[in-house]
Every structure is written in C-alpha cells, then in structure tokens.
From Swiss-Prot:
Descriptive protein name: UPF0434 protein Sde_1297
Pfam families noted in UniProt: Trm112p
Organism: Saccharophagus degradans (strain 2-40 / ATCC 43961 / DSM 17024)
Domain of life: Bacteria
Family indicated by similarity: Belongs to the UPF0434 family.
Entry's Gene Ontology cellular component terms: cytosol
Length: 63
C-alpha cells in the first residue's frame, strides 16, 4: 500500500497532473498523459521511459 501523504504530493512528471493509485496493478496512473508509472518494492518509478502507455479502454476506465 502506498502512503496517502506521499500520493498527495506526487504528480505526473510529463503533465504535472494528479495521479491515480491502482493498487492491484501497483501503478500510478495519469489519465492526462496516458501513462502508468510502476511501483517497485513500494517505490514509485516516476520516469517517463519506465512508464507503460495506457490503452484507450484503460484511460476511459480511470475517468
């Protein structure tokens, strides 16, 4: 589980938009950029090159 205080401070490094915590997938999702940043060993990896591109269906599911 990601600390809620930490989550409130983090934003997408590309768009500066807020992130959505997807606990089952262990990702931080940015709908604005269409990217999902992995969480590895409890640490968010906030690098654009490490992010996964969301499908259109995934983007819609987070709205």
């Amino acid at each position: 589980m990601l600390d809620q205080k930490l989550l409130s401070l983090l934003v997408c490094p590309v768009t500066k938009a807020p992130l959505i915590y997807d606990e089952p997938k262990q990702e931080l999702v940015c709908v604005a950029s269409g990217l999902a940043y992995p969480i590895r060993d409890g640490i968010p990896v906030m690098l654009e090159g490490e992010a996964r591109v969301l499908s259109q269906e995934e983007k819609e599911s987070y709205k």
